[in-house]
């Protein structure tokens, strides 16, 4: 299903275990953020068509990190859409390393993926009516990013932060230290609308991030005690 939260931004939910995808209709180009798992591609395609967009009208696809529930359906789009990811995510996506091989649990072959543009922190993408700022937010994975629109104060957070302060698991390439630092950085920004990779959207963003920092610190301390 899809929902329009604010003008030119569409929320697309194809169902678990796939992530939430976000479509931004820009003045200059159309951008999809995260494609979901490959098995949900037909649902994604139909939801895009309900909005009035065919897959060949997508110009860019930005992946928030290197987990298959966020990039699996790229395989059906990468021949006609520019794929963007942070360079730390891109290296895993194209080489099918241990992080990406986890996608076999979803019955998917991890080989054959492409990333056309390797992004860095604070890269910007100007769509005319939307100004997208790339924030490198490692922690969940080393290649995790958030997409921030500073004028609309919207954050598309991938798996970095969720509503109600729910925190992400830490993957093999991530770390609690990086995760807490990334959350603290987000906590300095003005954000009115949180659009996470899973679950509900939120307008209580400052409270959500503060809860997430507290939860991450508690989990990190528990891990340190157990590790001893």
Indicate where each model-derived feature is located:
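Short Pro/Gly-enriched beta-strand edge/turn motifs at strand-loop
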Residues: 3-9, 103-107, 128-130
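C-terminal regulatory/interaction regions
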Residues: 226-228
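Short catalytic-loop micro-motif centered on adjacent basic/acidic residues
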Residues: 11, 31-34, 60-62, 134-136
